[in-house]
Amino acid sequence: ALFDGKLDKKENLSVFTIPQLSIQSSGNPARTLKADARISLSDDHTHDTVNAAGDSLGLKEAAAALEGFAPKSDAAALMRQMTPTGQLENFRFALLGSPKGTPDVSFRDIPDRDPEIPGMPGVRHLNGSIAANPETGMVKAWGENGEASFPGIFPDPRVPFRKLSGTAFWSVSPKLELNFRDIELHNQDINIKGDADWIDTGGSGTIRVTATAANSLVKSAYKYVPTLAGAGIIDWLHQALLGGTAQNAAVEWYGPIDRFPYNGRDAKSGLFLVTGNFRNSSLDFLPSDKRTETGARVIGGDWPIVSRVNGQFLFEADRMVIAGDTGISDQVPLHGVIAEIPHMGG
């Protein structure tokens, strides 16, 4: 560490001013923090402050520093859970009050955050900015050729992306609330845009999602259905949808998560609705349990596959309807084919 500082003592307050502070880590590769810092320490530690601004700081090193300076703070606990990597650039940092309190932090330009802890959402290869304090915060992010992690949310917890962008906001008072705006996700399966909100209303909370998708692969739809939709829906989609392209898909979902899928006595408590069109699809309407000698599932084992299908699909609560305007089965032209499952949960 290299620095040339100045110490001022005023009544019960000591002020350290350190211009051009330089600290090099002992890791491999070594990383260097360069910053301007100002530290104020009161005799009773009730008015301690730390202010720093610099051009580059490793997230891993920042977590270690926070752990050493304020190990009991909420920010240090969050860093321990997230195990972040990557670099902060053009950052500003402020810690106000006693080291035992919660810091007020403002960072900019976060190139990386790796998801390695089971159960903790995360992202690889992310760029963006973050500003936060104990009550509210905002993250604006974008990335290319990375991976997002949503443990427990989707059948496959890891979702790769070619491009990802959006803004997230949060507040903790009067209730924890998360808001996601202008989210865009593009990968080899899906192209989706949308907004989402989550509020801590007890239990699993209340959610609101509105989204649209264009030119997405029908056979990959099951990957993006929330696991709380039930194994019946996800398994059927995985086995029955064999190909084609989904177009003009729209998603509308709101209500208490614990009451999903909002049928029966809970019908008025929320809404889950997915609609759209599909083209040139292949459907195995009645997926078979029959297996080949190698253990592979026999496609079309109980009912002939319907191919070259154009039509519409609808998911409402736990009801599913697939309406094929045209299609072919065993070389027989079909018109007005409808597959409906009133209760996908069984």
Each model region followed by its residue ranges:
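Membrane-proximal interfacial segments on either side of biological membranes
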Residues: 8-14, 31-181, 190-323, 327-329, ...
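Hydrophobic/aromatic interaction determinants used to assemble and anchor large protein complexes
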Residues: 21, 27-29
